[in-house]
């Protein structure tokens, strides 16, 4: 499938803490008066990472975004193996959930309700060593992915991802740019000499170090999975990034 386990890989390692409530929706602004001059359309931003050319044309045309789940399930099952797919992947709204997850990872929060992967089994353990051990089987699955095949499937299906990104509210932006940006943000996660200290001011655990707590959602996921797991995930992310930008 796509980059379901690429930039979105960090969601394998989501801690099972209760999700913070979302802020109230922002009301739409009042429409401008009828005689107000129309604003000038802003120029489209430069595309930094064009989608690489496919090595061969897809054998058949793509389904619509609404009907894309069967194709995506088949692709993900082929890449991951059926057993891992059934245990780890949420089987509906795959393209939209991948796009939302990729877009959220570099942000402050990343709601679990739109992630394409099932949370790690078991409850969050505030002991860094014990908590990291829960993720090792998932890291092995991620490491075993064929980066070239993963990116090839993503490229062949790219129009669906771009459409979902436009529907998310970014009609003039390139989703592939956001994907590379999300991968780069994960790769920039701090590499600590020792496990970070956690505190529990209310319901949720937080990093005691304010700098770590202010990091992006994706980087905090990398920190929570433990240094060894994070290093292994970063190695695979580098492979995927090379395939995305050097074709």
Describe each model-derived feature in a short phrase:
Residues 1-8, 161:
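Hydrophobic membrane-insertion alpha-helices, especially the h-region
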Residues 9-22:
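Hydrophobic single-pass membrane-insertion segments
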Residues 23-130:
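N-terminal Sec/ER secretory leader and immediately downstream segment
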Residues 73-85, 132-144, 213-219:
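Acidic/histidine-rich, surface-exposed loop or edge segments in extracytoplasmic proteins
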Residues 86, 109-117, 149-154, 165-179, ...:
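Surface-exposed patches in mature extracellular/periplasmic domains of secreted proteins
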Residues 123-177:
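Mid-length scaffold segments of soluble, non-membrane domains
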Residues 189-193:
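Conserved functional acidic sites
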Residues 194, 198-247:
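A cross-kingdom marker for long, charged
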């Amino acid at each position: 499938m796509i980059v379901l386990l690429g930039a979105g890989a960090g969601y394998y390692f989501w801690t099972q803490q209760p999700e913070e409530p979302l802020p109230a929706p922002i009301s739409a602004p009042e429409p401008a008066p009828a005689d107000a001059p129309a604003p000038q359309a802003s120029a489209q931003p430069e595309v930094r990472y064009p989608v690489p050319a496919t090595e061969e044309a897809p054998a058949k045309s793509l389904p619509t975004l609404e009907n894309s789940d069967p194709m995506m399930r088949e692709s993900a099952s082929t890449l991951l193996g059926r057993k891992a797919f059934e245990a780890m992947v949420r089987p509906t709204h795959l393209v939209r959930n991948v796009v939302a997850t990729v877009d959220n990872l570099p942000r402050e929060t990343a709601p679990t309700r739109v992630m394409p992967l099932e949370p790690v089994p078991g409850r969050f353990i505030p002991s860094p060593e014990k908590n990291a051990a829960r993720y090792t089987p998932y890291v092995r699955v991620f490491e075993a992915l064929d980066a070239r095949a993963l990116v090839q499937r993503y490229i062949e299906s790219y129009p669906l991802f771009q459409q979902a990104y436009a529907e998310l509210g970014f009609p003039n932006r390139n989703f592939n740019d956001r994907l590379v940006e999300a991968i780069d943000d994960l790769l920039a996660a701090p590499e600590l000499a020792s496990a970070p200290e956690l505190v529990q001011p209310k319901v949720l655990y937080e990093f005691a170090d304010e700098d770590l707590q202010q990091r992006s959602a994706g980087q905090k996921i990398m920190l929570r999975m433990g240094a060894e797991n994070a290093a292994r995930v970063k190695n695979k992310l580098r492979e995927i990034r090379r395939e995305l930008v050097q074709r």
